[in-house]
Amino acid sequence: DLQTTGADHSATVNPDQQLIMTKHSATVTPENKCVFPFNYRGYRYYDCTRTDSFYRWCSLTGTYSGSWKYCAATDYAKCAFPFVYRGQTYDRCTTDGSLFRISWCSVTPNYDHHGAWKYC
């Protein structure tokens, strides 16, 4: 249950810090970082997700263990350069393979292996 409604979840937020919520309590700590990829309920995530939540969140460990936080702009996955796509190495965003010719990049060094990407 990652939604923050209910009696178990309450905290005040300092706008200069990130709100870190666990399943049972909330703690404000500025140094916690998202871990990518992370495993949650049998799936691997390479970026922040809305799974089981109204807002995008990430795990603070490689395998979700109850430590997580809402994602800020700086938490989202970054392009991994260089990356491999269809056996070719790219050192910048590409429109190759994009149906609508929109620039994209892999968020892992090997798109062919992981299939994880984002728009540039």
UniProtKB/Swiss-Prot annotation:
GO terms for cellular component: cell surface; extracellular space. It is found in: Secreted. Disulfide bonds join C34-C58, C48-C71, C79-C105, C93-C120. Residues 29-73, 74-120 form the Fibronectin type-II domain. Keywords: Disulfide bond, Fertilization, Glycoprotein, Heparin-binding, Repeat, Secreted. One of its GO terms (molecular function) is heparin binding. Major component of seminal plasma. It comes from the Eukaryota. Residues 1-28 are annotated as: 2 X approximate repeats. Glycans are attached at T5, T12, T22, T27. Sequence repeats lie at residues 1-13, 16-28. GO terms for biological process: single fertilization; sperm capacitation. The keyword Glycoprotein applies. CDD domains: FN2. Its main location: secreted. Gene3D superfamilies: Fibronectin, type II, collagen-binding (2.10.10.10). Pfam families: fn2 (PF00040). O-glycosylated on Thr. There are two forms of HSP-1 which probably differ in the amount of sialylation of polysaccharide. One glycoform exists as a monomer while the other forms a heterotetramer with HSP-2 and binds heparin. Could enhance the fertilizing capacity of spermatozoa upon interaction with heparin-like glycosaminoglycans present in the female genital tract. Belongs to the seminal plasma protein family. This is Seminal plasma protein HSP-1. It comes from Equus caballus (Horse).
